[in-house]
């Protein structure tokens, strides 16, 4: 039942568990070595941010290529859509074969989930760039690189930022899947380990930290998106 402390730890137990995890740590992952909430959070955050950064770099590059080259897009986009629609959980056995049980597997799951929304949104933004401005750029002798930098990419920024917000959520899912299903050290692995041993309060602490982490990442990207939108609005008002 909902009042069962094993199934639903009361707030007082969760607070006590958080204090112990922060101050002393607890033995976990089948080892006598104590792990603290800080070390678990840093491990997960490190994998999340590094994987997300890699997805931004590769997602932007691939998105620009697909947005500027229609033939390449016709060939590649069905594969992109298939990867986007495939649940990452079913790829876990293959990822273990490719990368083993370690840091690289964690990074790959984050990258795989986060890069595809960035690719899709960047490609859409590139295609929706204003053709009149592009024609003006061609008429004054701008190179492809100059067009991308000064004309096309500025117009695609709102699409890219929207893609980053979606990607952030998928990156969080990727890091948790990686840690839980590959039994990796981190908040996700800690939730699985503690839950299996009916230490519900400890598991709830890790769940709450993951929720705060995800909300902070997505909210910061949303703030960046709104700042850019207000800046563009001011630019248009000055032009008129």
Residues covered by each model-derived region:
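Transmembrane-helix boundary motif in ABC transporter permease subunits
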Residues: 50-80
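Hydrophobic alpha-helical transmembrane segments of polytopic membrane proteins
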Residues: 188-223
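Short cytosolic juxtamembrane segments of multi-pass membrane proteins
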Residues: 225-240
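Short cytoplasmic-facing helical segments at TM-TM junctions of multi-pass membrane proteins
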Residues: 118-163
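Transmembrane alpha-helices
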Residues: 108, 112, 145-178, 205, ...
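Periplasmic/extracellular loop-to-transmembrane helix junction in inner-membrane transport proteins
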Residues: 1-53
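Alpha-helical membrane-protein architecture signal
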Residues: 15, 34, 38, 42, ...
């Amino acid at each position: 039942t909902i009042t069962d402390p094993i199934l639903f730890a009361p707030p007082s137990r969760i607070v006590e568990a958080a204090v112990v995890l922060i101050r002393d740590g607890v033995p976990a992952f089948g080892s006598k070595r104590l792990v603290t909430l800080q070390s678990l959070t840093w491990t997960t955050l490190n994998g999340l941010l590094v994987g997300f950064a890699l997805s931004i770099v590769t997602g932007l590059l691939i998105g620009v290529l697909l947005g500027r080259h229609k033939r390449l897009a016709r060939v590649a986009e069905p594969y992109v859509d298939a990867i986007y629609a495939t649940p990452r959980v079913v790829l876990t056995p293959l990822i273990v074969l490719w990368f083993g049980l370690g840091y690289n597997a964690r990074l790959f799951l984050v990258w795989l989930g986060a890069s595809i929304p960035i690719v899709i949104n960047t490609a859409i933004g590139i295609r929706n760039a204003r053709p009149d401005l592009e024609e003006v750029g061609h008429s004054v002798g701008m190179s492809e690189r100059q067009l991308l930098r000064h004309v096309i990419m500025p117009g695609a920024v709102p699409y890219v930022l929207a893609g980053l917000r979606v990607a952030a959520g998928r990156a969080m899912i990727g890091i948790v899947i990686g840690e839980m299903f590959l039994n990796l050290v981190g908040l996700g692995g800690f939730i699985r380990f503690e839950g299996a041993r009916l230490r519900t309060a400890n598991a709830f602490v890790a769940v709450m930290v993951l929720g705060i982490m995800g909300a902070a990442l997505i909210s910061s990207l949303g703030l960046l998106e709104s700042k850019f939108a207000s800046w563009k609005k001011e630019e248009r008002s000055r032009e008129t």
